[in-house]
């Protein structure tokens, strides 16, 4: 059985890690052992923050909706309750976009919600 030398595979593995560490500062971008740790940690942060991003954006949408609804003398929780009563099925992302970019349409929705809450 022939002897297996691992020079080619080791070089490929090292090259992959070094390429992933491009743009890092100091020895993190050209020393394999340090770059490997940096890339592993970057992957952990990326994994965690892909999940965290969803929470952050939802909070942003809620904040924007709340600010826009308060201009119409209503609170966020009353507004969301009114949306359910008026059976308006718009998600928070769309509502936040409307509150920022299409104030007239958002005002019309608030008017419908106020009618549903009053009824």
From Swiss-Prot:
Gene3D superfamilies: 6.10.160.10, Ribosomal protein L20. Keywords: Ribonucleoprotein, Ribosomal protein, RNA-binding, rRNA-binding. Coiled coil: none annotated. One of its GO terms (cellular component) is ribonucleoprotein complex. Pfam families: Ribosomal_L20. One of its GO terms (molecular function) is rRNA binding. It comes from the Bacteria. HAMAP family: Ribosomal_bL20 (MF_00382). Belongs to the bacterial ribosomal protein bL20 family. This is Large ribosomal subunit protein bL20. It comes from Burkholderia multivorans (strain ATCC 17616 / 249). The lineage of its organism: Bacteria, Pseudomonadati, Pseudomonadota, Betaproteobacteria, Burkholderiales.
């Amino acid at each position: 059985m022939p002897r297996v030398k691992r020079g080619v595979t080791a070089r490929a593995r090292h090259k992959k890690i070094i390429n992933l560490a491009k743009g890092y500062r100091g020895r993190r971008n050209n020393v394999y052992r340090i770059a490997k740790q940096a890339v592993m940690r970057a992957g952990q942060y990326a994994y965690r923050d892909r999940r965290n991003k969803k929470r952050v954006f939802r909070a942003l949408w809620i904040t924007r909706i709340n600010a826009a609804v308060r201009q119409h003398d209503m609170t966020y929780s009353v507004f969301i309750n009114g949306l359910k009563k008026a059976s308006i099925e718009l998600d928070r992302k769309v509502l936040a976009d409307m509150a920022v970019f299409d104030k007239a349409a958002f005002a019309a929705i608030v008017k419908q919600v106020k009618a549903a809450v009053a009824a």
